[in-house]
């Protein structure tokens, strides 16, 4: 996938996820999604170096009877995270 296509896809998924009132009401997840959206508006890929997205979506899932919007699942696959410990 070309970088610009990936950025556009991430933007669309975040926008769609934030349209969901349950997602919007989850403060931690919605703030993180807004950061991801802001990064994509600036034409950059969001790099989740703190690995915040997966735990935020997991907590959302637990709070909503293990139901997660498809947009969040697809977003997890697109957002880059570190694969290993990178040192100090």
Curated annotation (Swiss-Prot):
GO terms for biological process: bacteriocin immunity. Keywords: Bacteriocin immunity. Disulfide bonds: none annotated. It comes from the Bacteria. Signal peptide: none annotated. Transmembrane segments: none annotated. Could impart immunity to carnobacteriocin-BM1 to naturally sensitive host strains. This is Putative carnobacteriocin-BM1 immunity protein.
């Amino acid at each position: 996938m070309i970088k610009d296509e990936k950025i556009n896809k991430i933007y669309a998924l975040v926008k769609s996820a934030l349209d969901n009132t349950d997602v919007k009401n989850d403060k931690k997840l919605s703030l993180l999604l807004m950061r991801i959206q802001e990064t994509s508006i600036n034409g950059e890929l969001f790099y989740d170096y703190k690995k915040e997205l997966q735990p935020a979506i997991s907590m959302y899932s637990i709070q909503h009877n293990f139901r997660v919007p498809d947009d969040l699942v697809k977003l997890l696959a697109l957002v880059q995270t570190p694969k290993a410990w990178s040192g100090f």
